[in-house]
């Protein structure tokens, strides 16, 4: 029939479980939805055209691998991790052309929002102090993924800590290539190529208003002049950005926003950023 299934595949308090080789093409709100599980393996999945998010991991989860999946053309984000999530590997995935222009609809999202209803990835965002955030994704290895042409950021970390981002290729995302935000700390980014991000080319007036930049107008090509960097450090601390290639981004290469404390940026190739310079804005290699 024409009815939309809420979730195509659900793992609920699962242990020692593998899900491999499925193709999910539309017909549901969420492709794969994992809740409070451990020792699970999701591999070689192709998830596209779902109404909301392709793959969600919610609640308390540990000891898992998301490997060689293709998450593409979904309508409101791709991979979404929310909760006390640890000791996992996210490797070799292709995360491409997913819609949704808000921060929490990035290609890969790590966040710490309190989960009032575990059946939805849209719990209300609280107004809370950073020191009250006690459950967020940590001790994850995010390696060798391609994150490209998403309508929001490539990777968005909201309070994630002690995570390792290694050898990822992150390009042509409409917002930042990577954003470490809202108390993210102690993360390590190395060997990544982060290029051609931050153009804000495909955003509606509603999207720009939500980011408080609609009043900046639009450039001749229809994009917003308020371009974004390859890597944004926003209310974050003790991160290491080492040995990456950060090039051809529309805003700055690496930008520290609001509070950015005791971060280490070294041995990176930061080349030909500021592609979106205009009469209104000029950007830099490293902007503090």
Task: Tell what function each PLM region has.
Residues 73-142, 150-153, 158:
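Solenoidal tandem-repeat scaffolds enriched in leucines and small polar residues
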Residues 1-40, 53-60, 81-83, 233:
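Extracellular beta-strand-rich solenoid/capping regions of secreted or surface-exposed proteins
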Residues 169, 179-183, 229-230:
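Core solenoid repeat modules with strong leucine/isoleucine-rich periodicity
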Residues 264-269, 282, 286-288:
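Predominantly extracellular beta-rich ligand-binding scaffolds that present long acidic/polar faces
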Residues 15-16, 37-41, 60-63, 84-87, ...:
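Short "repeat-start/strand-capping" segments in structured domains, especially the N-termini
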């Amino acid at each position: 029939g024409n009815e939309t299934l809420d979730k195509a595949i659900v793992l609920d308090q699962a242990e020692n479980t593998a899900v491999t080789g499925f193709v999910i093409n539309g017909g549901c709100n969420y492709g794969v939805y994992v809740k409070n599980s451990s020792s699970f393996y999701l591999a070689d999945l192709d998830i596209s055209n779902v109404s909301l998010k392709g793959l969600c991991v919610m609640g308390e989860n540990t000891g898992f691998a998301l490997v060689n999946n293709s998450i593409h053309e979904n309508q409101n984000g791709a991979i979404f991790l929310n909760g006390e999530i640890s000791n996992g590997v996210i490797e070799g995935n292709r995360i491409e052309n997913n819609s949704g222009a808000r921060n929490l609809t990035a290609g890969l999202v790590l966040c710490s929002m309190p989960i009032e209803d575990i059946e939805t990835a849209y719990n209300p965002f609280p107004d809370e102090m950073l020191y009250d955030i006690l459950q967020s994704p940590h001790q994850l290895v995010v390696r060798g993924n391609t994150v490209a042409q998403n309508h929001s950021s490539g990777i968005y970390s909201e309070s994630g800590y002690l995570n390792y981002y290694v050898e990822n290729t992150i390009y042509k995302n409409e917002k930042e290539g990577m954003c470490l935000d809202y108390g993210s700390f102690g993360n390590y980014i190395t060997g990544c190529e982060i290029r051609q991000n931050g153009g804000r080319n495909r955003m509606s007036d509603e999207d720009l208003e939500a980011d408080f930049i609609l009043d900046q107008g639009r450039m001749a090509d229809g994009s917003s002049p308020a371009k974004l960097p390859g890597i944004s450090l926003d209310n974050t601390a003790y991160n290491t950005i080492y040995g990456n290639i950060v090039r051809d981004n529309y805003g700055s290469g690496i930008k520290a926003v609001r509070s950015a404390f005791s971060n280490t940026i070294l041995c990176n190739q930061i080349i030909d950023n500021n592609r979106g310079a205009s009469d209104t804005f000029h950007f830099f290699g490293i902007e503090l």
